Amino acid sequence: MNKVVNNAETAIQDIHDGATIMLGGFGLCGIPENCIAALVKKGTKNLTCISNNAGVDDFGIGLMLQQHQVKKMISSYVGENAEFERQLLSGELEVELIPQGTLATRCMAAGYGMPAIFTPAGVGTEVADGKET
């Protein structure tokens, strides 16, 4: 499989409704702006987005939130997006908050094909409630 594509539309063509996608970058730096724009244009819905943040209004994942394309957000920081807050408080958006280091460790484990990994972060806190420890 050739991993090099000519444009964002080609890069996202196999992302379907209900897919789980991981978006890179840190804050607003290094995010896949063109791929996000292509997903907005394509109208892909019910996405689970994994990212260290939820973007801001009118930029990044915030654009997909405005179009109600995100069903679930898995993130370590979500504090700068008013639309995110509105959808969360209205029950439209499912959210899984994860400490930054744990998020990075989970992504690494997934890359290695590991179905689970233990990290002591969060043990004995609300993060661990309802989870096997």
Can you describe what each PLM-predicted range is?
Residues 1-133:
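Conserved alpha/beta enzyme-core scaffold
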